[in-house]
Amino acid sequence: MKRSLQALYCQLLSFLLILALTEALAFAIQEPSPRESLQVLPSGTPPGTMVTAPHSSTRHTSVVMLTPNPDGPPSQAAAPMATPTPRAEGHPPTHTISTIAATVTAPHSESSLSTGPAPAAMATTSSKPEGRPRGQAAPTILLTKPPGATSRPTTAPPRTTTRRPPRPPGSSRKGAGNSSRPVPPAPGGHSRSKEGQRGRNPSSTPLGQKRPLGKIFQIYKGNFTGSVEPEPSTLTPRTPLWGYSSSPQPQTVAATTVPSNTSWAPTTTSLGPAKDKPGLRRAAQGGGSTFTSQGGTPDATAASGAPVSPQAAPVPSQRPHHGDPQDGPSHSDSWLTVTPGTSRPLSTSSGVFTAATGPTPAAFDTSVSAPSQGIPQGASTTPQAPTHPSRVSESTISGAKEETVATLTMTDRVPSPLSTVVSTATGNFLNRLVPAGTWKPGTAGNISHVAEGDKPQHRATICLSKMDIAWVILAISVPISSCSVLLTVCCMKRKKKTANPENNLSYWNNTITMDYFNRHAVELPREIQSLETSEDQLSEPRSPANGDYRDTGMVLVNPFCQETLFVGNDQVSEI
């Protein structure tokens, strides 16, 4: 009974141990991984809003400002700018925060005032991997999207203009995208290239016609690619406000990643009240988000240079000019300022940028569609990127003009050299968001292969299937149960083995001897007397001389020899 209880105790102990290990594995598997936090600031957010971003080792914070304008009065479009916090002496930091700020201006009325470029979205990505050597700065990407301006340039060109000459109609996007040499513009280039651009861009409509107009701002992360069609409206450009005393100050939204884990979004003057629009749509928290702004004509404003931090440069702006609203054709420009640690030339494509953000593989592809009218040929801007204290070679590349469409897709907007630069910006393998050489100019820009490495690598996660868990349980339970059985058998054998006297040889000898004498008891004979001598012996008894018993009638009996009796020397009698 005791032995069976011991075996049961051993099996119960092994079962409890297996159960504890299984629960530990299940807890390790089901522990939720940190997700990217997403803060959405609606248009009604008061000035000075503090957005707190958790400062983990790899955390991406997306701040999106939607600024819809009511009917009638023009208002300033937001010019968000995300500026990195530079590190002194080029030491490799240990944390990475990527803040992407984007502003969408929702168009409304048909008679709104179009004076300059509408939102100028500047996304400065602070990429700080640990494997970066000293003296090498993180790449800085600035994206500016001016959707509307007046058509005729002024005589005084803007400061430090770097603009590529217009692309001929027969040229391909690869050639236009790969050339990165900035060409100074010609002052009289407006009248020279007006007709060529009008022929290349047939979608420009005269004043007063109805056409679909709006801005679709999409942040692609993973496989979430959804959008909402904008509402059609008309664009009525008027006399610009640039250079007058009544020119309003730009509304600047700054999202600055600082070590204090907060992002400050200050706002300045705004001419018109803002209200929330149903166009802001937020997708699933875990996978990604899609933001769509619906509305009518954008109330375009001028975003001038207004620094928001000591390290931040002014927001890039484009000066609108006087002229006929129907002279210039419609096109949209993208400005991409990249400040990498090496002086490698790179090309850009309008409406698409990919941010390399630290050791977590994450790709943010922004597709912006902003059809507009009347951007002059000679007008250009110079976006200034916030530079780091370390040695940085700044290269300003202007984007190529492209045709105005209702919705700008990413099928033919992905450049090949940009993906190469992004993938080789940092030497760490985990920082490579886009594999080099996978995207080609002629192929469709499918982002499904980028989303495969989209999961955060915060820790070594263990993913086990049901069969794996079953094998683990068997591998743990079988040795424990076998050991318990062996211990039980050994204990039983030890208790059976006791001190047995039968193993001694002398015991058997004594037993055999005693048993023999007990069974074969020999009764010694008494005196045998004959009738003749009985009287004589009674009369005179005498003893045999010198032990001679031959004549006395005595019988010597050998107990070990039971066949014969010796009576004297010559008399043998059988018993």
UniProtKB/Swiss-Prot annotation:
Record PTM text: Glycosylated.
InterPro entries in alphabetical order: TMEM108
Region of interest (Interaction with DST (isoform 1)), ranges: 173-407
Record membrane topology: Multi-pass membrane protein
Region entry Disordered, spans: 65-398
Cell compartment(s), UniProt: Membrane; Postsynaptic density; Endosome membrane; Cell projection, Axon
Description of how the protein assembles with itself and partners: Interacts with DST (isoform 1). Interacts with SH3GL2. Interacts (via N-terminus) with CYFIP1 and CYFIP2; the interactions associate TMEM108 with the WAVE1 complex.
Role played: Transmembrane protein required for proper cognitive functions. Involved in the development of dentate gyrus (DG) neuron circuitry, is necessary for AMPA receptors surface expression and proper excitatory postsynaptic currents of DG granule neurons. Regulates the organization and stability of the microtubule network of sensory neurons to allow axonal transport. Through the interaction with DST, mediates the docking of the dynein/dynactin motor complex to vesicle cargos for retrograde axonal transport. In hippocampal neurons, required for BDNF-dependent dendrite outgrowth.
Name of the protein described by the UniProt record: Transmembrane protein 108
Native species: Homo sapiens (Human)
Gene this chain is encoded by: TMEM108
